[in-house]
Structures are given as C-alpha cells and as structure tokens.
Amino acid sequence: MDGESWYAKDRPPGDRVWRHLQYESYIVNEILPRLPEPPLAAGASFGALHSVLLAARHPTRISGYIALSGAFDTSKWLNGYHDDNVFYTNLVEFLPGLNDEAYLGPMRAQNPKVIATGADDPNVEDSRRVAGLLQSKGIQVGLDIWPGWAHDWPYWKDMMRRYLS
C-alpha cells in the first residue's frame, strides 16, 4: 500500500496522503467491524507508522500496538506539501496538540504499547520522538532501543517474537 501512497513519488503529495487515508478508511470501515474485538496493530517501518497512527486516530478500535523501526514523520515523503490531511497523518505534528480525553483516555488504556528500534536504525530518532510525545500525554508507551540492531526483517522477526511471547 505504501507504494501507492507515501512512496509514490510519481504522484502529487496530496494524492499520496489521500491514498493512505483510503487505505485507513478501508481498515476502519470494512475490516475492523468484522472482528469480534479490537485487534493489536503491529508492523515494522511504515507498518509501525500504520500501527501507531491507527491506534492514535481510532483508539477505541485498536487494543494496542507493537511498532518496530517506525518511520513516523511523514513530512519526509511529501516535498514540503502540507494540508489538514498531512497534519492528521503525521504523528509528530498532531500529537503535541492532542488534548482531547476522548482520544487520550482510550490511548492510555491500550495494551501493549511498544515502540522498538535498533540503535543503528535510520528511524531511531523518529521512535524516540513519538514515544516522548506519547509519554508527555500520560501514555505509558514502552520504548526499547535494541543495541546495534538495524532496519531489516531478521531483526524485526526476533523483536516481534519477544514482544508477542
């Protein structure tokens, strides 16, 4: 999906964000209603973004998240383009101003709340930043920085095994 949205450099930035929102809408309106209970959202890299973004934008619909090596600052892929859709799909932009207890209360109740990355991962600062923003809202998210671990599937497989066990 990210190849049709965030990574689609041949498309105008506004179209990329809109495509992401279509994907999110599909999950929220077509998949989640068919589940017996709110699921755990988990993913790596852009999947980590999707996990935490769903948990923040739809906190009563997601039970918790495990986000590995997240690329959380979506502005990097939009060439300076900005509108309301960009704002509300960029965790580093909208979390600082989020003060609505209708969102924050359910976000605090989510379990687990894990953001993990490797010390050598190119997105380590994004992970630190988003975890700090969540913690500043009273959301007890675990931030794990794995020594020497980088941005790759073998590492994520080991990480996910640990967090799911």
Regions found by a protein language model. Give the residues of each.
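Non-catalytic cap/lid and distal C-terminal segments of serine-dependent acyl enzymes
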Residues: 1-165
